[in-house]
Amino acid sequence: MLLTMNLQLFAHKKGGGSTSNGRDSESKRLGAKSADGQTVTGGSILYRQRGTKIYPGVNVGIGGDDTLFAKVDGVVRFERKGRDKKQVSVYPVAN
């Protein structure tokens, strides 16, 4: 009669978990800050991003960290730019 043994090895030191775990970066709050159709003032941040995920359109500037901002007061419009790109524009509203 042949006996088979099931031998399982487990960690014998578990105390290092609190040291090796427990690191997470703070969220960067990226993304849209103004919605399509929303009225904004000049200088308002429209979209925070890393790289040019969305391109600047009419009356929209781009900051050093690729943040898109309104250059004039107006209404925000998210539009397609070509086949696979997006852009955001701000169109002034006639009083």
Swiss-Prot record:
<dbReference type="InterPro" id="IPR018261">
    <property type="entry name" value="Ribosomal_bL27_CS"/>
</dbReference>
<feature type="region of interest" description="Disordered">
    <location>
        <begin position="12"/>
        <end position="38"/>
    </location>
</feature>
<keyword id="KW-0687">Ribonucleoprotein</keyword>
<feature type="propeptide">
    <location>
        <begin position="1"/>
        <end position="10"/>
    </location>
</feature>
<dbReference type="GO" id="GO:0022625">
    <property type="term" value="C:cytosolic large ribosomal subunit"/>
</dbReference>
<dbReference type="GO" id="GO:0003735">
    <property type="term" value="F:structural constituent of ribosome"/>
</dbReference>
<comment type="similarity">
    <text>Belongs to the bacterial ribosomal protein bL27 family.</text>
</comment>
<dbReference type="GO" id="GO:0006412">
    <property type="term" value="P:translation"/>
</dbReference>
<dbReference type="Pfam" id="PF01016">
    <property type="entry name" value="Ribosomal_L27"/>
</dbReference>
<keyword id="KW-0689">Ribosomal protein</keyword>
<dbReference type="InterPro" id="IPR001684">
    <property type="entry name" value="Ribosomal_bL27"/>
</dbReference>
<protein>
    <recommendedName>
        <fullName>Large ribosomal subunit protein bL27</fullName>
    </recommendedName>
</protein>
